[in-house]
């Protein structure tokens, strides 16, 4: 089921009406623009997941790996998801995806339970390691500085109604 973005009451209603295993969300909605979720809403998602004992999963496929000014966008929201997924920025153009499991979900998979034809590709894995080695405080500061510059320049431009985003998204 899908809930309306930034509407915690809609999420609560859907959780109460359905058998829900997880709440999965993107901190920045990338369809129809670049629209960050509010910090209040994401905090409420975390509270609902904790209260209902369901998994909280953040999809960082577009937002992860420094694109938002932190390693992952959720880090700007003061929450800790049970599962984090990431892909695009991790591979630097190479096909790779990762799901990182926290304590609540760490025992879901054991060696041999999940396989992939392309899993463990040595070139993509080397590329991902190279990307991760390059993401440091200096790079993240640069992302934030460029983000502020772009937002300030666009905000004053003629014909611009609003500027949304997070970091360089």
Could you describe each region identified by the protein language model?
Residues 1-169:
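Conserved N-terminal phosphate-binding loop of PLP-dependent enzymes in the Aspartate aminotransferase
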